[in-house]
Amino acid sequence: MGYRYIGSKVKVIDNVIGKISELCPSKGRVADLMSGTGVISTELRKRDYKVTANDLMTYSYHHSIVNLKFSSAPNFEKLIAFISDFHEVKPELSPYENVINFLNNVKPKCGYFWNEFSCEGNPQNSERPRNYFSPENARKLDGIREVINNLSCDNILTDLERSLLLHDLIMAANDIANIAGTYGHYMSRLNGRALTQLNLKCTDLLLKSDVENHIVMQGYAEENASKIQCDLCYIDPPYMKRQYAANYHILETLARGDEPEAIGISGLRPWRDQYSNFCTKTKIRDSFK
């Protein structure tokens, strides 16, 4: 399943990279100021560019870390030692595969996602339940989220490992979310995809000994642009007025690992701190300055 994301460049990646290569030779530094799902940044790394990836959203930050900052397969040394006392660690599997297997078997719980985003829930700020996930998948999300948060708090995960697991969780949730395309609202009935079981999968990591060449930043493009030195800057601003912070609020909550107030029928998190002027007709010109 592909990443359901507005403005994804998967289908035009060769055109974009082709134009970049005309303007900047391989091994040059390219800034991807609004990196989104990281498709362009990843392809640039494959072609031996030095990449600076920036985006406002936390989920994008984790995607870029995973795409740009792995030189070898993760060994999850502390986590494997921790879970070996109560979970079967299979010698025929890699440490990463064992960790994903462990997370897929975490005990579900009725927590924040089940209460706020499933049809069995009783949301605090809505008269009716929201239908973003099946009750079973929402409980799985709650169980896995709690485990990842606890492992992070106990320093059992490195920052790199945490980003990888959050990336995997976001990708798995996006596959089975009961949405038409964005998280601005849910579909009234659970469709076939939403009825399938949440299942984390190992990411096919791009492993290269070039991680020192790449920089990952999070913040407003207008503010971070002046901090970046590069040979070419690739800017892919939003094409419409819909704010990414609102339309992908659930992915942002998964990335942050928090439990924000879910507001209104759609259960939006407070997102004004990630409001983009590039989505506003009256402000976009000043943002480019």
Identify the residue ranges that each predicted region occupies:
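Conserved proline-anchored active-site loop of SAM-dependent methyltransferases
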Residues: 16, 30-44, 53-58, 226-247
